[in-house]
């Protein structure tokens, strides 16, 4: 079809459609408003301001009389202290694109929309601007079936590109003109949609747009609408073979018409490349992008766009317009009628992925036009579901229709107890993470679950019928549900209620099974609050399989057999599971058979929160020498050999094991080592076993982020058994802006001095210690935060001991990659406190030293390493040089101490993958430890008992984090702690030895502030 003929037919359609729409009668239960816009704007590309006129004809097809109109003035959100700005700065997890950027906009960078004049049917009308909402008090109310003409003159300034709308993006695009004009608010059976703009979702009214845009002639425009004057414009829009006749002057006026759309968006740039493609028997595709080395994928995007439109037109329904434009814009990806804006510096997979997602919105949003502010899951979610299906088709990948990624994303949110119901207004979610899940994720999950509940064929028919029946009609969730019920023959109110109105978890369990003389008994339990039908695959000892299907009673029906999922496996349908019954008993008579394996939901289409109880025998995945990432479908265990050597402890041979379920739940760390003892003095009696076992379990009944850890450790002749309860305070636990951690630890410590290596013998008492440790930390105490510890203990069941410490640090970002940390710590303990708890400010306590895996792994190789190489265990206090031997250090271990530190850290090579792990340091510290009944028993400071003070420089390198070790670091505590440092204190107060310069060069291992 020629472009001329297409334009003629579109004009006929436009006139005919407008006539039919304007002639519709008011129907009490099935109506929608309609508008026509006639706008003329003139954009000054030097000032980034434009003047505009707008004639709006508003048709009231509702049964209500309207005495007010409401407009959105979106640009007003881009001003300091606007609601969008305040919300972005106060929310728990700000959108990184916004953050506090609006707050720092200058007068030339803000956005605004000023109404210069407004008339109702030619008469001045009273109006009021409330930030992003314009309230109009009509002179004459609009009766049902009536209309009003509003004439507006307005002035706008385009804000610096921050979110969706704006100018001069990070990729250099001049104008992304979205939410750019005074837009009439939506009105439906729920009333006016007048939420102030904070950067989230929208609700629009279908209408016809006639838009003229005048700007510098060097610019090219792309967007919504059909260009009416292509031969005056050219720039790739011209009709081939016809002469381009541009008007005189340095400006061009672009004239667009767009029938039956809910919005109008456009971009303008002076360096656009414009490529045009044609979908066979479909729309024309326009690609407008800034060509360059980082935009090469756009050359291939056109073919993918054509194929995507063809695929979706068949899968969902015909593409509803004659044009689709992919525009290189300023912010991520955003959908508008006939067009999408995407950032352009992407690889092909990313570019195709975002194009597909935004293209799908043409079906699920700009055509259906649900109220995104209330039902974002119906648009973003359905789009997300279809995106993976479409990209799999485009790239020839075999992929499941089940949105596993959405399942795992939402399960993570449930695990962190941050989920909010999907029926929450888009602006009212407490976190951006919950909003993202409630819009993008939940709708995708709805589709995945519907495919499981009623079958994939019925779901596909539902999608097609939903689009066909409800396009251009603003459907709501009930209308989608009714389509699904009609196509499936099932009752689904129960499903939509729990999926949309609650955050209930799905958790079904195989409790037990038994086989006796061919009689099979299986007990299933519903441990979660949410309901689901059950697919249960039974595998028998003779190699045969049987699918047991149990519908939910509330469905009042069953799904058809699914040969596309289960092949020829025979299906047995049992009586429905009543929602009032938490347990379901299965009894089958299968002569000569016994059960070898049972799997609940073998197709992985049910978003079960705990699949460890979905398979019997227990689903265990054993891997060799691999990091444990956590799996949804099984408990992962990784094992590897462990070998080491120490001069005093001898050879170590053993096994290291790690285990975890999804999200690091049910964490297991275990290591067992046979030690030979000193090889030079080897005796069979010296052979011993060291071990380190810990298991962490989430305590669901204690709220968010509560865990219990049980641990038993023994190495180098010292052991500890403990039970630790950790609870993060606050609604969001570990996700709080400033975390608050409360810990309670019961422990037993003991020592066998005959197995201690020499350096530990002097720092650890022989007697056993039973104790209780209580800790409370706010923030990250080693960076910015405070921590206090209270410890009570009983040594050898006789003397009582106790201690209290307080530590605080505050870190400032002085410049890029340069920080300054101010720290202080103070502690006091009873005079009877064990030796391993006593403080010397030049280094860690004996207990801390024993816990320093990296330090002992290195120093135990040879007993001379600490003295010959000046190797010490870091404690982050800045007084490390005083811990060296033979320097005459005045530091003593006491039951009281204080330290103060200033630590400057610079990472000059942050852009390099390896060198970014290096930091240069400048530090100063002072401190003192002493013995006394009370902390106030501070000793007299003199030459023989000086105050310790040090100033120096250093360099650190996080050796365990180099990329080559990324596979091994999660498996090794040694690598996790392996931070090496070289520190050179050039001033140290009060040294009393003959080798004070030896203290000026210290190699440190690990860092524990």
Segments predicted by a language model, with ranges:
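Hydrophobic helix-coil surface modules that form long, contiguous segments used
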Residues: 184-191, 199-359, 385
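Short loop/turn motifs that connect adjacent beta-strands in outer-membrane beta-barrel proteins
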Residues: 631-635, 664-665, 699-707, 731-741, ...
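Outer-membrane beta-barrel "beta-signal"
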Residues: 952-955, 959, 997-1009
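A surface-exposed beta-strand-loop module
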Residues: 59, 96-172, 247-248, 576-593
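Hydrophobic alpha-helical and helix-loop surface patches within well-folded domains
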Residues: 19-23, 34-35, 73, 256, ...
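C-terminal outer-membrane beta-barrel translocator/porin domains of Gram-negative envelope proteins
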Residues: 643, 707-713, 722-726, 741-745, ...
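Outer-membrane beta-barrel initiation region
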Residues: 544, 584-590, 601-701, 727-731, ...
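Beta-strand-rich binding/interaction modules
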Residues: 25, 222-223, 492-493, 506-601
């Amino acid at each position: 079809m020629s472009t001329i003929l297409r334009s003629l037919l579109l004009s006929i359609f436009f006139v005919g459609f407008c006539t039919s729409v304007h002639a519709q009668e008011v129907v009490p239960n099935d109506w929608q408003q309609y508008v026509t816009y006639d706008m003329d704007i003139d954009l000054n590309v030097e000032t980034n301001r434009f003047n505009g006129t707008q004639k709006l004809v508003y048709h009231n097809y509702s049964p209500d009389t309207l005495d007010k109109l409401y407009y959105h003035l979106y640009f007003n959100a881009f001003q300091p202290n606007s609601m969008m700005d305040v919300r972005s700065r106060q929310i728990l997890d700000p959108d990184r694109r916004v953050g506090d950027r609006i707050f720092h906009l200058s007068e030339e960078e803000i956005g605004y929309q000023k109404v210069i004049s407004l008339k109702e049917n030619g008469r001045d009308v009273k109006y009021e601007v409330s930030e992003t909402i314009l309230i109009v008090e009509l002179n004459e109310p609009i009766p049902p079936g009536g209309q009003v003409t509003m004439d507006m003159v307005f002035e706008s300034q385009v804000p610096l590109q921050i979110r969706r709308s704006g100018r001069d993006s990070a990729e250099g695009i001049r104008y992304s003109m979205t939410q750019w004009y005074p837009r009439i608010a939506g009105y439906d059976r729920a009333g006016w949609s007048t939420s102030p703009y904070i950067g989230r979702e929208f609700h629009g009214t279908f209408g016809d747009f006639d838009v003229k845009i005048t700007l510098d002639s060097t610019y090219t425009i792309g967007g919504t609408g059909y260009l009416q004057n292509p031969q005056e414009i050219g720039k790739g829009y011209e009709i081939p073979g016809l002469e381009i006749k541009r008007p005189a002057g340095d400006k061009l006026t672009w004239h667009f018409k767009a029938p039956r759309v809910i919005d109008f968006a456009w971009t303008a740039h002076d360096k656009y490349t414009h490529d045009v493609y044609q979908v066979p028997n479909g729309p024309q595709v326009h690609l407008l992008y800034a060509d360059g080395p980082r935009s090469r994928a756009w050359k291939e995007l056109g073919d993918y766009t054509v194929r995507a439109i063809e695929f979706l037109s068949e899968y969902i329904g015909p593409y509803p317009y004659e044009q689709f434009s992919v525009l290189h814009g300023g912010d991520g990806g955003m959908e508008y009628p006939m067009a999408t804006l995407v950032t352009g510096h992407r690889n092909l997979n990313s570019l195709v992925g975002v194009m597909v997602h935004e293209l799908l919105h043409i079906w699920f949003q700009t055509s259906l036009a649900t109220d995104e502010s209330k039902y974002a899951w119906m648009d973003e979610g359905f789009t997300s579901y279809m995106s993976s299906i479409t990209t799999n088709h485009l790239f020839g990948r075999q992929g499941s229709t089940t949105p596993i990624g959405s399942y795992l994303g939402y399960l993570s949110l449930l695990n962190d107890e941050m989920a909010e119901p999907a029926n929450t207004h888009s602006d009212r979610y407490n976190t951006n993470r919950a909003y993202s899940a409630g819009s993008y994720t939940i709708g995708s999950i709805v589709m995945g679950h519907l495919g499981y509940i009623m079958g994939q064929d019925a779901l596909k028919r539902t999608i097609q019928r939903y689009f066909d029946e409800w396009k251009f009609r603003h459907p709501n969730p009930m209308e989608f549900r009714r389509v699904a019920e009609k196509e499936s023959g099932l009752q689904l109110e129960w499903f939509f209620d729990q999926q949309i109105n609650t955050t209930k978890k799905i958790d079904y369990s195989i409790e037990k099974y038994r086989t006796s003389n061919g009689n099979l008994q299986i007990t299933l339990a519903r441990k979660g609050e949410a309901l689901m039908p059950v697919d249960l695959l039974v595998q028998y000892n003779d190699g045969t399989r049987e699918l047991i299907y149990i519908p939910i009673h509330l469905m009042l029906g069953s799904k058809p057999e699914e040969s596309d999922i289960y092949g020829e496996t025979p299906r047995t349908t049992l009586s429905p599971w009543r929602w009032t019954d938490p347990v379901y008993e299965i009894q089958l008579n299968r002569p000569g058979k016994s059960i070898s394996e049972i799997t609940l939901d073998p197709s992985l289409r049910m978003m079960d929160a705990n699949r460890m109880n979905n398979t019997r025998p227990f689903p265990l995945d054993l891997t060799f020498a691999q990091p444990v990432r956590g799996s949804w479908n099984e408990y992962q265990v990784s094992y590897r050999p462990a070998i080491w050597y120490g001069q005093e402890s001898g050879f170590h041979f053993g096994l290291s094991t790690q285990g975890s379920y999804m999200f690091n739940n049910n964490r297991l760390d275990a290591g067992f080592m046979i030690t030979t003892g000193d090889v030079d003095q080897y005796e069979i009696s010296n052979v011993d076993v060291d071990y380190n076992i810990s298991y962490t379990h989430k305590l669901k009944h204690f709220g968010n982020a509560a865990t219990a850890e049980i641990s038993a450790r023994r190495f180098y002749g010292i052991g500890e058994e403990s039970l630790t309860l950790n609870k993060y305070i606050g609604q969001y636990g570990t996700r709080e802006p400033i975390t608050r951690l409360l810990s309670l630890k019961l422990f037993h410590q003991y020592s066998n001095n005959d197995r201690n290596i020499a350096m530990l013998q002097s720092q650890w008492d022989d007697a056993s210690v039973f104790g209780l440790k209580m800790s409370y930390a706010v923030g990250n105490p080693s960076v910015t935060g405070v921590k206090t510890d209270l410890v009570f203990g009983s040594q050898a069941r006789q003397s009582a001991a106790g201690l209290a410490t307080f530590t605080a640090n505050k870190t400032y970002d002085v410049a890029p990659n340069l920080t300054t940390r101010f720290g202080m710590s103070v502690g006091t303990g009873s005079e009877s406190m064990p030796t391993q708890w006593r403080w010397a400010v030049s280094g860690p306590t004996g207990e801390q030293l024993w816990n320093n895996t990296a330090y002992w792994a290195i120093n135990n190789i040879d007993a001379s390493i600490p003295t010959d190489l000046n190797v010490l265990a870091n404690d982050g206090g800045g007084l490390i040089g005083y811990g060296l031997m033979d320097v005459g250090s005045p530091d003593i271990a006491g039951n009281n101490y204080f330290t103060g530190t200033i630590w400057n850290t610079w990472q000059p090579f942050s852009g390099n993958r390896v060198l970014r792990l290096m930091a240069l340091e400048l530090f100063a510290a002072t401190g003192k430890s002493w013995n006394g009944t009370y902390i106030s028993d501070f000793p007299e400071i003199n030459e023989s008992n000086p105050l310790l003070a040090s100033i120096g420089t250093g360099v650190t390198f996080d050796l365990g984090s180099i990329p080559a070790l990324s596979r091994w670091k999660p498996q090794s505590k040694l690598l996790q702690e392996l931070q090496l440092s070289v520190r050179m204190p050039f001033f140290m107060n009060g040294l009393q030895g003959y080798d004070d310069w030896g203290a000026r060069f210290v190699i440190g291992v690990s860092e524990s502030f």
